[in-house]
Amino acid sequence: MDKPAIKPQGSYISYFSNLVKQHGGINLAQGIPGFQPPSELLEALRSVINENVHQYAPGIGNHKLIEVIHKHYAKNYAVERDNFLVVQGATEALSLIYTYFNKLLGNDLCTLSFEPAYESYSQLPSIFGKRFISYPLDQDFSFSVDEFRSTITQNGVKVVFVSSPGNPYGKVWSEMEVKTLINLANELDFYLVFDAVYNDLYFDKPPYLPLNEISPNVFYVNSFSKMLCITGWRIGYLYAHQQHRAGLRTIHDYIGLCAPSVQQVALAHYLGHYSFGENFATIFRGKVRDNFNNLSVTLSKLGFYIPPTDGGCFIWAKLPKTITDGFQFASQLYSKAGVAIIPGEHFSKTHTHWVRLNIARPAQEIKQAEERITQFLSIK
């Protein structure tokens, strides 16, 4: 009998991903795209490398980049240029917003997110010593408005995080659901943080974005990391009501200062000349969708359950009935088959029998992972 693996402290994502980086294998653990960025973007980077762009960027973001972002959204939404803030990826955007909430609300800060919740949503409250509530979706992956309202009021929830498509479970929230959450935020006076990092990776219809409903209670977060396969560039942005502009910028000045200058200049050039990366995003989306379809079929044949999924770059899968411990399964899968995945308990204490697999990888790599998982289960 295999000796049970010891659970690490900290992020399971970092733990399993670092195993691959140190010892090799297939990394389906961390959300790292397995594709090169657009060639035109890399050419833009080469073209600006000798320009005077190697010092601090403006704290609010490169002005040309902000202009390109604003122009893109202004086609469909009533957005104001000055309400955008460029930051060091969506991770900084989330932590910046949460730090701002902590300053505003202090001990009254209670946060909620829907199960399974992305790690930042639960770990930020933990770092600050604040309450976090993990709210389960219904059997059909919807939510009861009355029960949700009751949870908000009874627990004094002040912040709700929602991502669309989600991570680890790729639910795309419908227009009606998003508007319901916004109406509740305005009515019950909590802050809704809408995380749209995966909004280009949808399988059917584009996700609904709440940029026409921005009020003092609604915040919007996005990033170029996944959209353009540049997770190492650390360029993201947020949009918030002008009421919060000064407060967010002040905190950003001291905990983030500015996003990388060279990358911002290159991005501004590329996005402005190549339709905001639309062609690249379309091709990338197709590859991820194909990987989802192919790997889902294989996993289903092996006894996994894959819930209806609308987008994102992950498969959220329930383990076969004979396997009940996702962490031990993930540990053995890596040690014996060299495939790194993430145990579901990292995202929800009640999902110990689930796992997350990154599908934003080359098709050949996904195929190799399928073969290794199949072989591993055949001899387990």
PLM-predicted stretches and their roles:
Residues D2-G10, S14-V48, I60, K71-K380:
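PLP-dependent class I/II
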Residues V53, V68-K71:
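Glycine-rich loop-to-alpha-helix module at the N-terminal edge of alpha/beta enzyme cores
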Residues H63:
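Aromatic- and carboxylate-lined catalytic core of secreted/periplasmic carbohydrate-active enzymes
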